[in-house]
Design a protein with these regions (language model features):
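C-terminal capping alpha-helices of c-type cytochrome domains
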Residues: 86-114
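Extracytoplasmic/secreted proteins, especially bacterial periplasmic and envelope-associated proteins
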Residues: 28, 32, 68, 91, ...
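Electrostatic cytochrome c docking/interface patches
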Residues: 14-38, 53, 105-114
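Gly/Gly-Pro-rich "capping" loops immediately C-terminal to redox-active cysteine motifs
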Residues: 30-38, 44, 48-86
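Bacterial N-terminal signal peptides
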Residues: 4-16
Length: 114
């Protein structure tokens, strides 16, 4: 009976921890992501803060969810060149995603980029 009770208590501790949300990206990841965003030239089409521009759509401040973002960057449609893992590794791409996620949203009165 004591073993069953201990097992039950252990489950009460383990199950919530398994379902806990992952920690948000540390600020260092976002700062490194901003440097990569600039170094890789993403800003040339998407603007310095991912707001979009003449040749690239808005990708920030609320980027696509990670799996969709990853797939799009690896095999984009349109004129964007593909950034294969040999050019931009997953860790670096996650940093760029963290940067885009960290950007503040646009002002409610700001005009929408074209």
């Amino acid at each position: 009976m004591l073993r069953v009770l201990l097992a039950f208590l252990l489950l009460l501790l383990v199950v919530p921890a398994a379902h806990a949300q992952p920690a948000s990206a540390p600020p260092a990841d976002a700062a490194a992501g901003q440097r990569l965003f600039n170094d890789m030239g993403c800003w040339q089409c998407h603007g310095y803060q991912g707001q979009g521009g003449e040749s690239g759509p808005r990708i920030g401040p609320q980027p696509l969810p990670w799996p969709v973002f990853d797939n799009y960057v690896r095999a984009p449609s349109g004129t964007m060149p593909p950034y294969r893992a040999s050019v931009l590794g997953e860790a670096d791409l996650r940093k760029i995603h963290a940067y885009l996620t960290s950007l503040p949203g646009p002002s409610p009165n700001a005009p929408r980029p074209r």
